[in-house]
Amino acid sequence: MFRRYLSVTKPGIIMGNLISVAGGFLLASRGDINPWLMVATLIGLSLVVASGCAINNVIDRDIDIAMARTRTRVTVTGEMSAMAALCHGVVLGIIGFGLLIAYTTPAAVFFAAFGYFIYVGVYSLYMKRNSVYGTFIGSLSGAVPPVVGYCAVSGEFDMGALILLVMFSLWQMPHSYAIAIFRFKDYQAAGIPVLPVAQGIDKAKRHIVLYIAIYALVVMLLPISGYTGAAFMAVACITSFWWLLMALRGYRRNIDISGWARQVFAFSIINITALSIAMAVDYQSIAPQLLALN
């Protein structure tokens, strides 16, 4: 029973979000860490994400059954009823939002609610099924966790929070398009109008390169604006440049498109994990660091 209730919350997604939440939280803390606030933020947002994923599984049952990757989900196989999954999601959401309301800030709660509404109400119920722009809308909800972590400390949506929101939104696009390419047949069978299916893999490849290039520039705004230091800048330059080179390899002749997309996807996770860790530990402004070298 525990396995069913855990699997419906998509633990892999929760773990990925935990890293970005912690990164945003520690970036805003700048070394002055409130451990209880951090625990409440991490647990609260994890439960909110788990809630959204559980309800998404209920909504997506009809398309999950058409996809090889998702047809073994417990809401599809009948191991868990739709009502049980829905109630599970609602309870997790109530507890998660309760923790955020009780222990964090109004700004953090607002963005958690914003991300939840976008993911469940806009993306899952409509955009994913009906529009090629569903990925873009979904990217907004995927970018919320680090902003929640940041705002839990700062209490406001400032330039640092805005950079995180744009940065993580841009990252979501090539990450998601890569999945859609190597899972092309799944999305096609389910009738989901992701860019590779709706407008072709060649256009998706161009978008992947474009988004990574813009993302690499936006990431630099953190050190340029004084939120992170030289170490973060080095990690960002190396990992983002390598990711861009990897994306450009998609234009080689006779390339295995599916294998290439898997590589782009895998490195996207390495990139965002490395940057989340880097911004958590290198929160000193780059200007004083450069002056210290003189």
Swiss-Prot record:
GO terms for cellular component: plasma membrane. It is a multi-pass membrane protein. Pathway: Porphyrin-containing compound metabolism; heme O biosynthesis; heme O from protoheme: step 1/1. GO terms for biological process: heme O biosynthetic process. The keyword Protease does not apply. The keyword Protein transport does not apply. It is found in: Cell inner membrane. One of its GO terms (molecular function) is protoheme IX farnesyltransferase activity. Its EC number is 2.5.1.141. Keywords: Cell inner membrane, Cell membrane, Heme biosynthesis, Membrane, Transferase, Transmembrane, Transmembrane helix. It catalyses: heme b + (2E,6E)-farnesyl diphosphate + H2O = Fe(II)-heme o + diphosphate. Converts heme B (protoheme IX) to heme O by substitution of the vinyl group on carbon 2 of heme B porphyrin ring with a hydroxyethyl farnesyl side group. Carbon 2 of the heme B porphyrin ring is defined according to the Fischer nomenclature. Belongs to the UbiA prenyltransferase family. Protoheme IX farnesyltransferase subfamily. This is Protoheme IX farnesyltransferase 1. It comes from Pseudoalteromonas translucida (strain TAC 125). The lineage of its organism: Bacteria, Pseudomonadati, Pseudomonadota, Gammaproteobacteria, Alteromonadales.
